[in-house]
């Protein structure tokens, strides 16, 4: 079991969904593959290995992470 985590096999397959509110529209966010409004929530799927980088990016853009859940394959509208 430890070897699975050590070589990253299991960790690499884990994905989490961030629910983010309050992102500002900037040149950097214009290049994203998803559209958002400042008042709405954005759902971003993030691989386990990039969680810290993505948190820093969201905070830098003025967003607030309101929830983090394991990705189940369901769309955001299915979960609500």
Curated annotation (Swiss-Prot):
One of its GO terms (biological process) is photosynthesis. This is Phycobilisome 8.9 kDa linker polypeptide, phycocyanin-associated, rod. Pfam families: CpcD (PF01383). GO terms for cellular component: phycobilisome; plasma membrane-derived thylakoid membrane. It comes from the Bacteria. It is found in: Cellular thylakoid membrane. Rod linker protein, associated with phycocyanin. Linker polypeptides determine the state of aggregation and the location of the disk-shaped phycobiliprotein units within the phycobilisome and modulate their spectroscopic properties in order to mediate a directed and optimal energy transfer. Residues 13-71 form the CpcD-like domain. Belongs to the phycobilisome linker protein family. Keywords: Antenna complex, Membrane, Photosynthesis, Phycobilisome, Thylakoid. The lineage of its organism: Bacteria, Bacillati, Cyanobacteriota, Cyanophyceae, Oscillatoriophycideae. It comes from Picosynechococcus sp. (strain ATCC 27264 / PCC 7002 / PR-6) (Agmenellum quadruplicatum). It is a peripheral membrane protein.
């Amino acid at each position: 079991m430890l070897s699975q985590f050590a070589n990253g096999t299991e960790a690499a397959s884990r994905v989490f969904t961030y629910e983010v509110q309050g992102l500002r529209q900037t040149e950097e966010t214009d290049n994203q593959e998803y559209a958002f409004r400042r008042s709405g929530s954005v759902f971003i799927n993030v691989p386990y290995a990039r969680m810290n980088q993505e948190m820093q990016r969201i905070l830098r853009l003025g967003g607030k992470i309101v929830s983090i859940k394991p990705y189940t394959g369901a769309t955001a509208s299915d979960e609500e």
